[in-house]
């Protein structure tokens, strides 16, 4: 299957050539899905399968790039720029329907809900509602099957899952506020950026000298609760840690320290899968208390310890077999990541201990060929936390910042995993 990544594959200005290229790539994509027994895309399916296969992912990324090129070519440069740079209103409209609870007012199923019913339930202006719903349905959020008659589709049904609703609501509210202050935050640093998590677009947007996490969990608790629930919603897009690294290969009784492990969900999952391992979940005390309040399954309770710990301080657990960092380092700048890793390195036992970094490795494609999802997530990390998503080269740079003895031994992923699949970087200390 051809998955060419050179500029010529997507930069044509010939409309017919572009259409033929899209058609052939779709054929290759569907053929690959059929070959691996995966579901074909269907917007009416609210729970689509996450495809990890490299060939399918490469074809999918190419289709997305080609379709973007097609839309730009048909619209023309000026209209394309206007459409792209007014897209913030799409997010604003989705945020509005979530705030009004329209996703709950429109009943699941084939029977439509009228605009008048939505007006009655919300008390909102019919004129404004109609204009908001027009934008949403055009962006495939709900279907308007007759004038002012709306039903759910596979996209809008996602909002009925509270974690997904919280994730999208956070993006449409907090995310838009951060985006509005993005350039101002960079101007403050003369466009050089900052390592300080309190000197961000987020801090400008909320007029605070606190970082995102501190603000959400100490000042605006309602936003903090939504954010925490939304982060749980983001889990549906992530590859399971235990599906990438063979924890069963660790020695019987091995100790895994889940650094910044939140409520302990990942440790519980791995403990249930691999009976011979012991876990220490480290995080803020309030986070750990929330995890314990939710309850730990009886079958693994004796093998999971909860330990309050700030990973910017000395690591108290010495010589563990594994120090796991799952989606921690992308929240931080290189200098802060180096501090986190250095504290772990000081606790490691050469020849025994390893660090497992469960985090994204951004593909090193040319800009036009790269993943838009990773690009936007990277800038979200910058705007909110002064963090970043990293390429393999950037990961290696960070590792060398920590210690010349710290080496990347292996990158783990699911079998045949592609550029958008999860990855685990295994780090060891040279003796």
Swiss-Prot record:
S-adenosyl-L-methionine binds at residue 283. Its EC number is 2.1.1.-. Pathway: Secondary metabolite biosynthesis. GO terms for biological process: methylation; secondary metabolite biosynthetic process. Keywords: Methyltransferase, S-adenosyl-L-methionine, Transferase. It is an enzyme of class 2 (transferase). The keyword Methyltransferase applies. InterPro entries: COMT-like, O_MeTrfase_dom, Plant_O-MeTrfase_dimerisation, SAM-dependent_MTases_sf, WH-like_DNA-bd_sf, WH_DNA-bd_sf. The active site is at residue 330. GO terms for molecular function: O-methyltransferase activity; protein dimerization activity. O-methyltransferase; part of the gene cluster that mediates the biosynthesis of the isocyanide xanthocillin and its derivatives. The first step of the pathway consists in the conversion of tyrosine into a vinyl-isonitrile intermediate by the isocyanide synthase xanB. Subsequent oxidative dimerization of this intermediate to form xanthocillin may involve the cytochrome P450 monooxygenase xanG, whose expression is coregulated with that of XanB. Belongs to the class I-like SAM-binding methyltransferase superfamily. Cation-independent O-methyltransferase family. This is O-methyltransferase xanE. The lineage of its organism: Eukaryota, Fungi, Dikarya, Ascomycota, Pezizomycotina.
